[in-house]
Design a protein with these regions (language model features):
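Glycine- and acidic-residue-biased ligand/ion/polar-headgroup-sensing regions
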Residues: 71, 81-99, 264-267, 274-293
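A short, N-terminal "cap"/entry segment at the start of jelly-roll beta-barrel domains
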Residues: 1-60, 163-254, 361-375
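Short acidic-glycine-tyrosine-enriched beta hairpin
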Residues: 99-117, 293-312
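Double-stranded beta-helix
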Residues: 3, 10, 121-197, 317-375
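Conserved short histidine dyad/triad with adjacent acidic residue
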Residues: 45-52, 63-80, 241-246, 257-275, ...
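Histidine-centered metal-chelating micro-motifs
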Residues: 74-76, 94, 113-114, 118-124, ...
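Short histidine-centered beta-strand/loop micro-motifs
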Residues: 52-57, 74-80, 97, 105-107, ...
Length: 375
């Protein structure tokens, strides 16, 4: 599949193109909850406002979004039906969980990534000194929406905001009667709230990865070639890594994998394809992504916290032409291990350096591998 310049421009969603909806949820009138920015970058996410701008509606198997808030602002307690991954881009946040936010809390700092379990009430506040910015990955093309804590729902209704059965907000002017009960999403019954699993801080933070914990390794066949010293560090699920000792922080299935990639100055990956749709969320450093081959080649330079949609089957290459390392997150659809497909010349060059893939698709010394068995 070829990517044209026009298509690449459409798929490279720059941070300056993200469009905030400042009243995406029913908690926007609660004290300490406004102003608050919600961004739907790839897919609608869980917005409850029909006017939310969505940069790219194409299904990827997951949604990419973001939230921005000033110091002291809170995103109130709610639960998801699929995974919610927080990527702390800028600022410092305090996570809280439980129906009243009293079951535990943890600090989320710049560069941290945490995978929040489904069916757990969670919220977060900007407890730093500057504007905070989080990016999110939500499992599934249809996330199913969210359930608000009953306490949040009651307080939101007192401000005139109700939630209809279509998961959209109903704004009732002061002094007007409440909407008919059969048109509203009901509050979660107390017995169901009590039945939810409780998570202690140690359990939750076992699902987080801090910058110092990133296990960067030479992890793909091409990375043994001169000038191709890029590295991977798994976060969630099983991604591109072909290193047999790599283990993600979160191994239970979420429907997607998340890995940090690091490209040192002057290094690159070889061009490769994947059978799955992917998204690159760029953190920092001079990173270009090139597509196609020969005269059809097109490329784009990523900016900080830009998002790039990479369709399945496209030939892509990560290149650092600068003087400092580049870091980005690669999110790929599916729970199974991914199999990056390199040109035969990459395999031949790696073999000359005594490196190959074993029968389990892991890196191994070619000199240790027996001849292929006839089938």
């Amino acid at each position: 599949m070829l990517i044209t310049r026009q298509e690449l421009t459409r798929r490279h969603i720059r941070r300056s193109q993200y469009v905030s909806c400042d009243d995406a949820f029913i908690d926007v009138r609660l004290p300490g909850s406004m102003p608050k920015e919600n961004y739907s970058i790839i897919g609608p996410g869980v917005t409850q406002n029909a006017t939310q701008v969505i940069n790219l509606r194409e299904p990827h198997g997951f949604n990419i979004g973001a939230a921005g808030m000033a110091p002291g602002i809170t995103n109130n307690l709610h639960l998801h039906f699929t995974a919610e991954v927080f990527i702390a881009c800028e600022g410092t946040f305090t996570l809280r969980w439980g129906a009243l936010g009293d079951e535990g809390e943890a600090l989320l700092e710049e560069g941290d990534v945490v995978c929040m379990p489904p069916w757990m009430f969670r919220g977060f506040s900007n407890t730093g000194s500057r504007h905070g910015f989080l990016m999110t990955v939500l499992g599934g093309d249809d996330t199913g929406g969210i359930i608000w804590s009953p306490d949040v729902m009651r307080r939101a209704r007192a401000t005139g905001l109700w939630l209809g059965k279509d998961n959209q907000m109903i704004d009732v002017p002061a002094g007007s009667p409440a909407p008919p009960e059969d048109q509203l999403l009901p509050l979660m019954p107390p017995a169901e709230v009590s039945a939810l699993r409780r998570w202690n801080p140690a359990e939750l933070m076992a699902r987080a990865l801090k910058p110092a914990q990133r296990d960067f390794r030479i992890a793909t066949l091409d990375a043994v070639l001169p000038g191709h010293g890029w590295q991977l560090a798994p976060v969630i699920g099983f991604g591109l890594s072909q290193h047999r000792d790599h283990r993600p922080a979160v191994s239970d299935p979420q429907g997607f994998s998340v890995e940090w990639l690091q490209v040192p100055p002057g290094q690159r990956s070889a061009a490769f394809t994947l059978d799955e749709a992917a998204v690159l969320v760029h953190a920092h450093g001079p990173l270009s992504v090139a597509f196609n081959d020969g005269n059809a080649s097109v490329s784009t330079l990523m900016g900080a916290w830009d998002t790039l949609s990479i369709p399945a089957g496209t030939l892509r290459q990560f290149i650092n032409t600068g003087s400092e390392p580049a870091h980005a997150l690669l999110i790929v659809n599916g729970d199974a291990r991914k199999r990056p497909q390199f040109d035969a010349s990459v395999h031949a060059q790696a073999a000359a350096l005594d490196m190959a893939l074993d029968a389990g698709n892991h890196l191994a010394r070619k000199s240790l591998l027996p001849p292929l068995m006839a089938v």
